[in-house]
Amino acid sequence: MELNTHNAEILLSAANKSHYPQDELPEIALAGRSNVGKSSFINTMLNRKNLARTSGKPGKTQLLNFFNIDDKMRFVDVPGYGYARVSKKEREKWGRMIEEYLTTRENLRAVVSLVDLRHDPSADDVQMYEFLKYYEIPVIIVATKADKIPRGKWNKHESAIKKKLNFDPSDDFILFSSVSKEGMDEAWDAILEKL
């Protein structure tokens, strides 16, 4: 599939099924804990500065945000999880919204699960990965902020993350940096393969 990634726009924000786009376009969902770099990932992948708003305040995305890419596919930005300052009730509401989308959306082709290369995956990261494996949803692990770690230590951090996730070697694992654009081509290859 040839994609003009410059031709991208935010299409709509949805709180539930009735608001989802009603067509056949394939979707790739992006999930990860708050401030893992999801907005930066979207902006880097689509060669845009601020299509997805980056925020110093975690927990800003509270709806599913659908991004139209060249009228051929969509990114779906899922609310960041694991943000402490959001009430338990809010978190449960998000949880249900995310679960409904991930388990019932026929357009969904795969989930890009973002983790921070600098740290061990959180319990939420592990739970998300297990959830995706349980429902047999294709998953691409993208380890963000690779530029913050010396290249010589990447392998060590990658191994630690894979071990904690109980990573399935048949899944893609991509080291990514929105600063250096490391892993961008690899991420696109993995995504397009799932469409």
Swiss-Prot record:
Gene Ontology terms: cellular component: cytosol
GO molecular function: GTP binding; metal ion binding
Binding site for GTP: 32-39, 59-63, 77-80, 144-147, 176-178
Keyword Nucleotide-binding included in the entry's annotation: yes
Pfam families: MMR_HSR1 (PF01926)
Keywords tagged on the record: Cell cycle, Cell division, GTP-binding, Magnesium, Metal-binding, Nucleotide-binding, Septation
InterPro entries linked: G_ENGB_dom, GTP-bd, GTP-bd_ribosome_bio_YsxC, P-loop_NTPase
Entry binding sites for Mg(2+): S39, T61
Cofactor(s) listed in the protein's UniProt record: Mg(2+)
GO biological process: division septum assembly
Start and end residues of each EngB-type G domain: 24-195
SUPFAM superfamilies per UniProt: P-loop containing nucleoside triphosphate hydrolases
Family: Belongs to the TRAFAC class TrmE-Era-EngA-EngB-Septin-like GTPase superfamily. EngB GTPase family.
Functional summary from the UniProt entry: Necessary for normal cell division and for the maintenance of normal septation.
Protein name: Probable GTP-binding protein EngB
Organism in which the protein naturally occurs: Streptococcus pneumoniae (strain Hungary19A-6)
